[in-house]
Each structure stands twice: as C-alpha cells, then as structure tokens.
Regions:
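Short, contiguous alpha-helical
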Residues: 1-126, 164-234
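Acidic/histidine-rich alpha-helical segments that form the ligand environment
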Residues: 127-163, 177-191
C-alpha cells in the first residue's frame, strides 16, 4: 500500500527520532548534531537506573516496593515503574532514564495494540525491563510495532476518529493523524531528556574519558524503526 503523502514526513520524523535515540543509548556512534559522528559507549545498567537527585521515580524490583512519593509499581513481572494513584504528585518527581524509556516503550506498545492489535493491553500488563539492554530492545520492538500500525493506514484512516482506542489519553476522541503527531513529540522530547541524562551521568564520573569525533559515517548498525538508517536529507 502506498503511504499517504501527508503521513510521509511524520513517518520520516519518527524513524529519525528512534534511530537517533537508539544510537545515543547504545552506540557505537551517534550524530553530533553537525553531521560529525561521535563514539558512544553503551548504556550500563547502573546508568540506566541512576538517580541523580533524591526522590527520583524509576523502574524497581517489585519486592523493593515503590519509590518516594509513589504508591504503586505499574506493570507486570519482576520490575515495575513508579506511579501514584489516583493522581501523580505535584510538582512531578524527577524520573530516571529507566522510567522515561519504559514510559515511551509502553506508550508505543499499547498504542500499536489499540490501533491494529487486540485492543486489550494495559499499563498493568506491560513488562518493564530492569536492565539497559533489555529496555533498549523493548523500545526497538515497540517502535517497530507502532510503525507497523502507521504503514497500515490509508488516507481515510488518518482522518478516522477513534481508530486508536489507547486508554490512557484522548485517542478515542481524536483523529488518528493528530495522534501520530503527538506520538512523535513524545519520542522526541523524552529522547532528548534521556540524551541529557546520559551527558550528566558522563560528566559526573560514571563514564571514563571524553567523547571525541570519530571516523566513518552515521552509525547505521542499530535496529531502528525500519527507515533507511541514515540522516534524512535537508
């Protein structure tokens, strides 16, 4: 099926945002922002769950219980993500890379399911990863699932209200192309937060050495989102 023309730039933006985040988390290279590749060390488990300030929300072993200000560990399995019911505290707690990455992956997985899947996944059934490699793989799989939902759409589907029945938002009241735009913003802004936390962890001594420009092209080895693997033109 031909991709609707108005979906093309949003799909390209999504592919690029996912590829850039994957490379920024696990390397071996990432784009410096000027087209110069820089070497990137893989994110460690310690960094993934690093709490830079007191009172962070994170992903925790269920046996350890929720973190400060949380009263529930959301998800299924050994690890849960800090949350609070009926409402989150204000101001919101500072969140770790683990929390932010789990949030993005859950959102993509559930939205894909509630668009082209069984329409039955919930945040309580999502399995969080306690290690960095598992979390990055989960993000890659979630991104692929959401991309699959996008490329299944024809032009009429983009204007359909309630095509996504994702329960943790206003999806049932929104045209689908607005949801596509919103999901891109979620990946972009949380991806930027994760990149900044990696920088902060590095300068606080968690990683040795300084990043230096390296030879070669843009790191195309990451299992991204089905795009071309390179930087979009322009």
């Amino acid at each position: 099926m031909t991709t609707p023309p108005r979906l093309v730039p949003l799909l390209e933006q999504f592919d690029w945002a996912c590829l850039r985040l994957l490379n920024r988390m696990m390397g071996p290279e990432a784009d410096s922002g000027t087209g110069t590749p820089i070497p990137v060390a893989p994110m460690s488990d310690e960094e993934y769950r690093w709490e830079p300030v007191p009172g962070c929300w994170s992903v925790r072993r269920r046996v350890d219980g929720p973190g400060p200000g949380a009263n529930v560990l959301r998800g299924a399995g050994e690890w849960g993500r800090d949350s609070a019911e009926p409402t989150h505290p204000y101001p919101p707690p500072f969140t770790t890379i683990a929390w932010r990455l789990s949030h993005i992956s859950e959102m993509l997985t559930l939205r894909a399911d509630h668009t082209v899947g069984g329409h039955n996944l919930t945040s309580d059934s999502y399995r969080n990863s306690g290690d960095a490699v598992g979390a990055v793989m989960a993000f890659g799989a979630a991104a692929q699932a959401w991309r699959g939902a996008l490329v299944s759409c024809d032009d009429a589907a983009l204007d359909t209200v309630g095509l996504s029945t994702y329960p943790d938002g206003s999806d049932s009241e929104d045209v689908f192309i607005d949801i596509v735009w919103w999901v891109n913003q979620e990946v972009l802004h949380h991806g930027a937060e994760i990149a900044l936390l990696r920088d902060l962890y590095r300068v606080r001594g968690g990683l040795t050495g300084r990043l230096r420009p390296g030879p070669g092209g843009y790191g195309g080895g990451s299992p991204a989102c089905g795009g071309s693997g390179g930087r979009p033109p322009g």
